[in-house]
């Protein structure tokens, strides 16, 4: 089936199923073009609370679809392929949290939304890269257990002055970890008039040389501050920014900064998922109830 026909069929099925397509900023351009709502993790979580549809087709990785289901237990949530997983989310296990709580029993557990539903059930509050600093600042504790991204944990510690215990100690996003000081130097030489926008999942030494450190939603909000940027995050964010601001120049810091989990979903997967109503996301209610409290607390504190 040609792309134009595939898009028409997806639109037809959306109407027939009363469905909405929610997609993350890292999705393929052709998916961004058909999404009803595009955003970062925080924006998608907020949107999921007020979705006016019977079916949510979540075009992101599995933990995002789980979050949508947790916030919409009565709706059908579809993840178009089971291969859309997040390696970092799977690094954090319940045992890591319990071990940290033994050592720091009074410390609140703050978990990145990039975690499984099972681990979210042990969180006092969840955060995204967009609101992590603000939420940790509001917590009445100088010691925080934070997982799973060690680089975001380091950034939060630096910005808040609090003691942040990373769980696990090796948690990271492989896409953002690959950005190096050499990439910073190359960007400065290639684009001398550009500023560098860097995601807080990047290594601390890369963050230190950034002009701004922001989530993907923050990149969108702050892009108009300058006329040329080098973007240190997943490659497809450049497409999103360029669509929004055609008069501003955006360059990917690395052409091969690709999230395999995000790229696992194609238009054909979306079509087949809607056609057959397959790959429905389910979260056991006992886990969902506990995780929901942590997510809703995040939304209240944001």
Curated annotation (Swiss-Prot):
InterPro entries: NadA (IPR003473), NadA_sf (IPR036094), Quinolinate_synth_type2 (IPR023066). It catalyses: iminosuccinate + dihydroxyacetone phosphate = quinolinate + phosphate + 2 H2O + H(+). Its main location: cytoplasm. [4Fe-4S] cluster binds at residues 86, 173, 259. Binds 1 [4Fe-4S] cluster per subunit. Its EC number is 2.5.1.72. The keyword Chloroplast does not apply. GO terms for cellular component: cytoplasm. It holds the Pfam family NadA. Keywords: 4Fe-4S, Cytoplasm, Iron, Iron-sulfur, Metal-binding, Pyridine nucleotide biosynthesis, Transferase. Pathway: Cofactor biosynthesis; NAD(+) biosynthesis; quinolinate from iminoaspartate: step 1/1. Iminosuccinate binds at residues 24, 41, 112-114, 129, 199-201, 216. GO terms for biological process: 'de novo' NAD biosynthetic process from L-aspartate. Gene3D superfamilies: NadA-like (3.40.50.10800). This is Quinolinate synthase. It comes from Thermococcus onnurineus (strain NA1).
